[in-house]
């Protein structure tokens, strides 16, 4: 009796949730950096389209090596898989027309929610006015 078992292996994408959790973890550990100018060679008037071979920013493994240094000198330099940023995000809690944020003052929030619509998060730690609304309706109930 000859039975044949065939196994096929293929790559598959991780679940959306696991990708989101991974990115959120990296986001929470992101490092603020400044760009070092040392080690960059070539004509700075060429703009972004200059020949990469002249810029001196290739690493030994053929990848691009960014010249990032920690914004705070007490912090360690970011690794090749770390998320980095140059500027802090604007404070979305306060109105800032230049950044295009309206702030959260005067917005409705849900006092019982722990999500983004919850008062604790939306009001940015400030106090908030509570109100209760009662609506009386005819229900056409039968007993």
From Swiss-Prot:
Residues 38-81 are annotated as: Disordered. SMART domains: WNT1. Its main location: secreted. It comes from the Eukaryota. Residues 46-60 have a biased composition (Basic and acidic residues). Residues 64-75 have a biased composition (Polar residues). Glycans are attached at residues 110-111. One of its GO terms (biological process) is cell fate commitment. It is found in: Secreted, Extracellular space, Extracellular matrix; Secreted. Pfam families: wnt. Palmitoleoylation is required for efficient binding to frizzled receptors. Palmitoleoylation is necessary for proper trafficking to cell surface. Depalmitoleoylated by NOTUM, leading to inhibit Wnt signaling pathway. InterPro entries: Wnt, Wnt_C. GO terms for cellular component: extracellular space. The keyword Glycoprotein applies. Keywords: Developmental protein, Disulfide bond, Extracellular matrix, Glycoprotein, Lipoprotein, Secreted, Wnt signaling pathway. One of its GO terms (molecular function) is cytokine activity. Disulfide bonds join 109-124. Gene3D superfamilies: 3.30.2460.20. Belongs to the Wnt family. Ligand for members of the frizzled family of seven transmembrane receptors. Probable developmental protein. This is Protein Wnt-1. It comes from Evasterias troschelii (Mottled sea star). The gene is WNT-1.
């Amino acid at each position: 009796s000859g039975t044949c078992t065939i196994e096929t292996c293929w790559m598959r994408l991780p679940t959306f949730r696991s990708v989101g959790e991974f990115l959120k973890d990296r986001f929470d550990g992101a490092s603020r950096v400044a760009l070092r100018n040392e080690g960059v060679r070539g004509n700075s008037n060429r703009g972004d389209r200059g020949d990469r071979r002249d810029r001196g920013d290739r690493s030994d493994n053929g990848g691009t090596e960014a010249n990032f240094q920690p914004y705070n000198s007490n912090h360690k330099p970011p690794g090749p898989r770390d998320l980095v940023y140059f500027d802090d995000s604007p404070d979305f809690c306060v109105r800032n027309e230049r950044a295009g944020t309206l702030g959260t003052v005067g917005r409705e929030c849900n006092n019982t929610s722990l999500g983004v619509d919850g008062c604790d998060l939306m009001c940015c730690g400030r106090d908030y006015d509570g109100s209760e609304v009662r609506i009386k309706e005819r229900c056409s109930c039968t007993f």
